[in-house]
Protein backbone atom coordinates (compact mmCIF):
# COMPACT_ATOMS: atom_id res chain seq x y z
CA UNK A 1 0.00 0.00 0.00
CA UNK A 2 1.10 3.55 -0.74
CA UNK A 3 0.31 6.37 1.72
CA UNK A 4 0.67 10.15 1.76
CA UNK A 5 2.64 10.74 4.96
CA UNK A 6 3.95 13.62 7.02
CA UNK A 7 6.86 13.32 9.42
CA UNK A 8 7.14 14.99 12.81
CA UNK A 9 10.86 15.48 13.50
CA UNK A 10 11.76 16.45 17.05
CA UNK A 11 14.82 18.35 18.21
CA UNK A 12 16.12 15.29 20.05
CA UNK A 13 16.32 13.34 16.79
CA UNK A 14 13.21 11.22 17.29
CA UNK A 15 10.49 11.24 14.68
CA UNK A 16 6.99 9.95 14.08
CA UNK A 17 4.80 9.61 11.04
CA UNK A 18 1.22 10.63 10.28
CA UNK A 19 -0.65 8.97 7.41
CA UNK A 20 -3.22 11.05 5.55
CA UNK A 21 -6.64 9.56 6.29
CA UNK A 22 -8.82 10.95 3.49
CA UNK A 23 -7.44 10.40 0.02
CA UNK A 24 -8.99 12.40 -2.81
CA UNK A 25 -10.45 10.56 -5.81
CA UNK A 26 -7.66 12.04 -7.94
CA UNK A 27 -4.95 10.74 -5.59
CA UNK A 28 -6.46 7.27 -5.77
CA UNK A 29 -6.72 7.38 -9.56
CA UNK A 30 -3.31 8.92 -10.35
CA UNK A 31 -1.12 7.45 -7.62
CA UNK A 32 -3.07 4.56 -6.10
CA UNK A 33 -2.87 6.06 -2.61
CA UNK A 34 -4.62 4.49 0.37
CA UNK A 35 -5.91 6.26 3.47
CA UNK A 36 -4.30 5.79 6.86
CA UNK A 37 -6.17 4.39 9.85
CA UNK A 38 -4.96 6.30 12.94
CA UNK A 39 -6.11 9.58 14.48
CA UNK A 40 -3.57 10.83 17.00
CA UNK A 41 -1.78 13.74 18.61
CA UNK A 42 1.94 14.09 19.27
CA UNK A 43 3.80 15.26 22.37
CA UNK A 44 6.67 17.67 21.73
CA UNK A 45 8.83 19.85 23.96
CA UNK A 46 6.87 22.88 22.72
CA UNK A 47 3.24 21.79 22.66
CA UNK A 48 0.84 18.97 22.01
CA UNK A 49 0.30 18.97 18.27
CA UNK A 50 -1.85 17.41 15.62
CA UNK A 51 -1.19 16.89 11.93
CA UNK A 52 -3.83 16.75 9.20
CA UNK A 53 -2.62 16.50 5.63
CA UNK A 54 -4.46 18.66 3.09
CA UNK A 55 -7.95 17.16 2.48
CA UNK A 56 -8.07 15.81 6.07
CA UNK A 57 -8.60 19.36 7.39
CA UNK A 58 -11.95 19.43 5.57
CA UNK A 59 -13.31 16.87 8.06
CA UNK A 60 -13.98 18.76 11.33
CA UNK A 61 -14.36 15.66 13.50
CA UNK A 62 -10.67 14.81 13.15
CA UNK A 63 -9.43 18.02 14.73
CA UNK A 64 -12.19 17.89 17.35
CA UNK A 65 -10.92 14.49 18.45
CA UNK A 66 -7.38 15.89 18.60
CA UNK A 67 -8.59 18.93 20.56
CA UNK A 68 -10.26 16.63 23.08
CA UNK A 69 -6.80 15.06 23.56
CA UNK A 70 -5.33 18.49 24.39
CA UNK A 71 -3.96 19.56 20.99
CA UNK A 72 -2.66 23.14 21.04
CA UNK A 73 -1.25 23.48 17.52
CA UNK A 74 -2.58 21.82 14.37
CA UNK A 75 -0.20 21.57 11.41
CA UNK A 76 -1.67 21.21 7.92
CA UNK A 77 0.84 20.53 5.14
CA UNK A 78 -0.88 20.68 1.76
CA UNK A 79 -0.48 20.62 -1.99
CA UNK A 80 -3.26 22.19 -4.05
CA UNK A 81 -3.32 22.83 -7.77
CA UNK A 82 -6.04 25.49 -7.95
CA UNK A 83 -7.14 28.52 -5.97
CA UNK A 84 -10.47 26.75 -5.32
CA UNK A 85 -8.69 23.80 -3.70
CA UNK A 86 -6.46 26.16 -1.71
CA UNK A 87 -9.52 28.10 -0.51
CA UNK A 88 -11.10 24.92 0.83
CA UNK A 89 -7.97 24.10 2.83
CA UNK A 90 -7.50 27.67 4.08
CA UNK A 91 -11.13 28.30 5.06
CA UNK A 92 -11.43 24.93 6.80
CA UNK A 93 -8.10 25.40 8.62
CA UNK A 94 -9.24 28.80 9.86
CA UNK A 95 -12.52 27.28 11.05
CA UNK A 96 -10.61 24.53 12.90
CA UNK A 97 -8.69 27.22 14.85
CA UNK A 98 -11.94 28.81 15.98
CA UNK A 99 -13.85 25.57 16.67
CA UNK A 100 -11.02 23.93 18.60
CA UNK A 101 -9.49 26.98 20.29
CA UNK A 102 -6.03 26.22 18.94
CA UNK A 103 -3.40 27.59 16.59
CA UNK A 104 -3.45 26.19 13.06
CA UNK A 105 -0.41 26.38 10.79
CA UNK A 106 -0.85 25.64 7.09
CA UNK A 107 2.15 25.12 4.82
CA UNK A 108 1.71 24.58 1.10
CA UNK A 109 3.81 23.81 -1.95
CA UNK A 110 4.16 26.38 -4.72
CA UNK A 111 5.69 26.23 -8.18
CA UNK A 112 5.44 24.14 -11.31
CA UNK A 113 6.58 20.64 -12.24
CA UNK A 114 5.50 20.65 -15.89
CA UNK A 115 6.52 17.07 -16.66
CA UNK A 116 4.88 15.48 -13.60
CA UNK A 117 1.29 14.36 -14.13
CA UNK A 118 -1.01 15.68 -11.43
CA UNK A 119 1.81 17.81 -9.97
CA UNK A 120 2.33 20.23 -12.85
CA UNK A 121 0.82 23.32 -11.19
CA UNK A 122 0.65 24.14 -7.48
CA UNK A 123 -1.00 27.05 -5.68
CA UNK A 124 -0.55 27.93 -2.01
CA UNK A 125 -0.43 30.59 0.65
CA UNK A 126 0.96 29.44 3.97
CA UNK A 127 -0.39 30.93 7.18
CA UNK A 128 -0.91 30.83 10.93
CA UNK A 129 -4.49 31.08 12.18
CA UNK A 130 -5.83 31.71 15.66
CA UNK A 131 -9.16 31.70 17.44
CA UNK A 132 -11.09 34.97 17.04
CA UNK A 133 -11.24 36.51 20.50
CA UNK A 134 -9.80 39.46 22.44
CA UNK A 135 -6.24 38.19 22.95
CA UNK A 136 -5.88 37.25 19.28
CA UNK A 137 -5.97 39.10 15.96
CA UNK A 138 -9.51 40.28 15.21
CA UNK A 139 -9.67 38.27 11.98
CA UNK A 140 -7.86 35.23 13.42
CA UNK A 141 -4.93 35.62 11.02
CA UNK A 142 -1.62 35.70 12.90
CA UNK A 143 0.55 35.60 9.77
CA UNK A 144 0.18 34.85 6.07
CA UNK A 145 2.69 34.43 3.29
CA UNK A 146 2.54 36.21 -0.04
CA UNK A 147 0.23 34.12 -2.27
CA UNK A 148 1.94 31.56 -4.48
CA UNK A 149 5.44 32.74 -3.57
CA UNK A 150 8.36 30.70 -2.26
CA UNK A 151 9.23 32.10 1.15
CA UNK A 152 9.79 31.32 4.80
CA UNK A 153 7.03 32.50 7.14
CA UNK A 154 7.96 33.14 10.79
CA UNK A 155 5.40 33.78 13.51
CA UNK A 156 5.63 33.69 17.29
CA UNK A 157 2.70 32.18 19.15
CA UNK A 158 1.90 32.31 22.85
CA UNK A 159 0.33 29.10 24.13
CA UNK A 160 -0.67 30.83 27.40
CA UNK A 161 -3.26 32.75 25.40
CA UNK A 162 -5.06 29.47 24.73
CA UNK A 163 -5.35 28.79 28.47
CA UNK A 164 -6.82 32.27 29.00
CA UNK A 165 -9.25 31.69 26.14
CA UNK A 166 -10.41 28.36 27.57
CA UNK A 167 -11.23 30.09 30.87
CA UNK A 168 -12.18 33.67 30.02
CA UNK A 169 -13.02 33.70 26.31
CA UNK A 170 -16.13 35.52 25.12
CA UNK A 171 -17.19 32.11 23.76
CA UNK A 172 -15.70 28.77 24.80
CA UNK A 173 -16.31 26.32 22.00
CA UNK A 174 -14.69 23.36 23.75
CA UNK A 175 -16.21 23.97 27.17
CA UNK A 176 -19.70 24.89 25.92
CA UNK A 177 -20.21 21.82 23.72
CA UNK A 178 -23.51 20.08 24.48
CA UNK A 179 -22.05 16.65 25.17
CA UNK A 180 -25.38 15.74 26.75
CA UNK A 181 -26.83 15.83 23.20
CA UNK A 182 -24.03 14.64 20.91
CA UNK A 183 -20.49 13.33 20.83
CA UNK A 184 -17.63 12.68 18.44
CA UNK A 185 -15.82 9.43 19.08
CA UNK A 186 -13.17 7.23 17.51
CA UNK A 187 -13.99 3.67 16.48
CA UNK A 188 -11.08 1.57 17.69
Tell where the protein language model's regions lie, with residue ranges.
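Short Gly/Pro-enriched turn/cap motifs at secondary-structure boundaries
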Residues: 30-32, 117-118, 174-177
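CN hydrolase (nitrilase-like) catalytic-core segments centered on the catalytic cysteine
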Residues: 58-150
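A short C-terminal boundary segment appended to hydrolase-like catalytic domains
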Residues: 157-188
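Short helix-loop capping/hinge motifs at secondary-structure junctions, enriched
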Residues: 13-16, 134-136, 162-164
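Short beta-strand scaffold segments in enzyme catalytic cores
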Residues: 4-8, 40-41, 106, 125-128, ...
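Active-site catalytic loop in hydrolytic enzyme cores
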Residues: 1-69, 82-95, 171
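A short, polar/charged loop-to-alpha-helix boundary motif
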Residues: 20-33, 150-164
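Non-catalytic surface loops within mature trypsin-like serine protease
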Residues: 10, 130, 159-161
Amino acid sequence: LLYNVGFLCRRDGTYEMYEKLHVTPDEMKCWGLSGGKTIRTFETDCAKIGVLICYDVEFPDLSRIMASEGMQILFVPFLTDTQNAYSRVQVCAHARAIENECFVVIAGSVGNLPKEHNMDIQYARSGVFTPCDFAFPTDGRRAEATPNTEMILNSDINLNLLNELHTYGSVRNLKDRRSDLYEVRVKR
